[in-house]
């Protein structure tokens, strides 16, 4: 039996993180598209890792539980890397909320029930969660603590209160951050830690969809006018995840780390600020 990592989302960011911290472990790779999971599994196995692909639908509690049970058949779950999700250009409002918001909440909840003492998790949200106007304290608390099966019934998540897919995505990512804070308290009762990384524009297939989508010029302008002057890479996100998931990050839990090359800073206080 081995320590087991659950990696959800067979993409560049998830793989980069798993390669940093997953050596010596069994890595169960879950993705909505089995061919994606198989591709990442093959690449990692050929590099000496021990992985297996699995089909998983993040919007389904049943699918999430099945993935966790599969992982437990190899040993205790000691790490979670959640890099699954959809983008504003890929999905309608309802799907964004069901996958990115509800699905992430369920995953953190279910893994939190079984995570090994000393275990650690990281979930990938987005800088988008930082771009919205502040919610009320009550709305933030509801996003953090409402029972998962009641999340999508919250008033602020009803269709008439959501402008477009970007707004839905922002709400989902804000919820991810709040949910990590609340769930980290429960994980802590098991002696485990949980954190969130909110990347900016990182070059991945998902980002390339955005660059070529209806908001492509917006995103290209964003990294052209942020302090870093460029998009990020998956390895740069993995740099931070490696810290958070190592013993050097032992005092870090319930936190969100914004890694966006300064784009959010420029949005509020620089050339990316919206015109009045």
Residue ranges and their predicted role:
Residues 1-28:
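Canonical Rossmann dinucleotide-binding motif of NAD(H)/NADP(H)-dependent dehydrogenases/reductases
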Residues 23-39:
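Conserved glycine-rich Rossmann-like NAD(P)H-binding loop of the short-chain dehydrogenase/reductase
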Residues 44-62:
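Rossmann-fold cofactor-recognition segment
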Residues 85-90, 117-190, 199-204:
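Catalytic loop of short-chain dehydrogenase/reductase
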Residues 135-146, 202-225, 266-276:
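A glycine/serine/threonine-rich, flexible loop-to-helix segment
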Residues 193, 252-254:
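Short, small/polar-rich loop/turn modules that mediate ligand/substrate recognition or access, typified
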Residues 226-237, 248:
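A conserved structural motif in NAD(P)-dependent oxidoreductases
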């Amino acid at each position: 039996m081995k320590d087991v990592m659950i990696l959800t989302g067979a993409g560049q960011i998830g793989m980069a993180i798993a390669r940093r911290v997953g050596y010596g472990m069994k890595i169960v790779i879950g993705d909505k598209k089995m061919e994606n999971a198989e591709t990442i599994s093959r690449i990692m196995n050929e590099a000496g890792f021990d992985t297996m692909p699995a089909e998983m639908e993040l919007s389904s509690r049943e699918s999430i539980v099945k993935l966790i049970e599969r992982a437990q058949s190899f040993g205790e779950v000691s790490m979670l890397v959640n890099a699954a999700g959809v983008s504003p250009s890929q999905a309608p409002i309802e799907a964004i909320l069901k996958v990115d918001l509800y699905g992430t909440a369920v995953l953190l909840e279910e893994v939190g029930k079984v995570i090994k003492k000393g275990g650690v998790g990281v979930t990938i949200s987005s800088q988008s969660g930082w771009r919205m106007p502040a919610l009320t304290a009550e709305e933030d608390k509801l996003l953090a603590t409402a029972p998962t099966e009641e999340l999508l019934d919250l008033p602020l998540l009803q269709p008439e209160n959501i402008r477009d897919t970007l707004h839905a995505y922002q709400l989902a990512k804000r919820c991810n951050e709040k949910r990590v804070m609340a769930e980290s308290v429960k994980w802590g009762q098991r002696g485990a830690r949980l954190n969130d990384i909110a990347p900016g524009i990182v070059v991945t297939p998902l980002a390339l969809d955005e660059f070529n989508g209806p908001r492509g010029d917006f995103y290209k302008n964003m990294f052209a006018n942020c302090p870093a002057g460029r998009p990020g890479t998956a390895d740069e996100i993995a740099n931070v995840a490696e810290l958070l998931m190592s013993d050097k990050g032992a005092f870090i839990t319930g936190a969100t780390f914004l890694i966006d090359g300064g784009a959010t800073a420029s949005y509020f206080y620089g050339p990316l600020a919206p015109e009045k």
